[in-house]
Every structure is written in structure tokens, then in C-alpha cells.
Amino acid sequence: MSHFSAVLLVLLAGTMWAASGTAAQHFYTQSVHIPIELTQVRLFLSSALFFLLAWWSGGLRRGVRSLRRSPRLLVHLSIHGILGIMIVQFSYFMGIAEGDAAATTVIGYTSPAMMILYLAVRWRRLPSAAETGTVVVAVAGVFLLVTGGDVGRLSVPMACIVWSLISGATFTFAMIYPVHLLRLFDRFFLLAVCMLIGGIALLPMTQVI
């Protein structure tokens, strides 16, 4: 994939993610459903779509063979499915329910800054000037958003801030953890299985509702 294509896909993904937040906010005002239900339905429907794409690309058969040869890979898929996919979506929708889509999206997009800090600690090196600038701008932007420039008050509910930061942190995890899985599985198969696992993990909670 070319650098231009990668940048284009990242921009498209970010735009669609923000649009889904706006749609979720509208959904909450028009229905009695709660974030955990929306998350589960979204995961199951997305999983079905990605299974079709995996079948179309030939990755479904290869993925099943890999799991038969090494069933322990299901543990890694479960970790990514729950921590890297399910929680990032659930916390994002919870942030929107507690606050609004705009604030949740902006706070959640501190994930690149979190990744820079993680990699700096992981590789024991100082961030570059550009990376440092990214962290400073991200933190300053969130500070202005949540305080409105007044340190003595919050313009965004604390619950929204917490859920949004959880979403950002788990999104960072989702970008780092599955690198080794992408070497083993087709990307469509990986997403299909992990989204299915994430949806199943929510069943005990949604059945109680």
C-alpha cells in the first residue's frame, strides 16, 4: 500500500469514527437503548460483514486452518477482541451518553499522544521534537476543551472525560497489540473473529438488562 493510500484511509477512518459518534448521540435521543446494547449490535453486524469479506478474500479458510493448528491463538484473539475492540467502542459510546459526541471524539483522539508516550517508555528514548509537539498540542487542546480556559470548572462532565480517556487508551492498545496477529491472519478474518468475541463477551451483561 502506498503512503498516500494509507493516509487517505486513516483520514477516512477518522471521519467515519466521528460520524458514528454523531449518529450514536442522535440514536440516544430517539430511543431507550443504552450504549452496551448499541455496542453489541454494532459488533455482531460488523463481524458478519467482515466474515463475508474474509470469505471473499480467501482469508477465512486460511484463518480457520491457522486456528486448528494453534488453538492457543484464540487467547490472543480474545484479548484483542475484548480490550482492543469491544472496550474501545463501549467506552466511546458511554462517553457520548455522558457528554456529547464532539467532546468524546476530541478527548479520545489523544490516543496518538498516548502511543508516543508508550513507545518512548517502551524503547527508552525521548520523543522527537515533532512527537513532543504532538503531545503538548493534544494535552493543551483537551485542557481547553474540558475547562473552557477556566481551571476552576469543568465544561465537560467528568464521566464523559473518564470514558473518553478509556476509549483513547484502549484505542492505543488496539493499534499496538495486534501487530503479531496481522502477520498470522488476514485482516478481515482478524476483525471478524475479534468483533464476534467482543460481542459475545457482552452477552452476560445484555441478558441481564
Residue spans for each PLM region:
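Hydrophobic transmembrane alpha-helices of multi-pass small-molecule transport proteins
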Residues: 50, 127-149, 196, 202
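Specific transmembrane alpha-helical segments of multi-pass solute transporters/efflux pumps
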Residues: 16, 58-102, 144
